[in-house]
Amino acid sequence: MATIYAAKSGKPPEPKQFYRDLATPGTLARKAFTLPYGLHAVSAMNNPAIRAQPIVSFGGIGSAAALGKFYSMLANGGEIDGRTFFSGKTIEWMTTTLTDGMDRVFQIPTAFSAGFMKDARNAKRRIFGTSPIAFGHPGAGGSHAFGDSENKIAFAYVMNQMEQSLLPNEKSLRIVDAIYDIL
């Protein structure tokens, strides 16, 4: 399958309350997304000098190939190339929804397993495909990666320039939809 998309792919609607909170000192969104570079933290991540810094929980930078390999290993029971990195029990915790409801930072319905995001029960738009056990995480700026052990799918999408976005961009979501449409 090959499709050429325009450079600007469009963005799904972003949660308006999140941006209001981001502009308000003292809110969870402001605390979570403005340290250490202020309100320009997302655009600052496009600077190679900033990207070289070890920023805990805000600097996960990798290639689509590396993310795809990671989620491929998870979607295949924690094993890759004959080596087991995670037990079946650990993978079960990754696929099991532990919390589901309104996210206090993003201000949208979210769900989480042990360490990963999942589609919320009442999500308006599924971002991890059709399987209820799929898990992963969108990246700040539009990136997106997940594993689906039910369908043996690993998906990773990154861009060479971050967008001002919290959620996967429309281009990546159309690719996810196309993958599941051919199953």
Regions of interest found by a model, annotated:
Residues 51-52, 136-139:
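Short, local alpha-helical segments
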Residues 132-134:
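A conserved acidic, glycine/proline-rich C-terminal tail/linker
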Residues 1-129:
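Short, surface-exposed loop or secondary-structure junction motifs
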Residues 138-183:
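Structured C-terminal helix/loop/strand segments within mature extracytoplasmic catalytic/sensor domains
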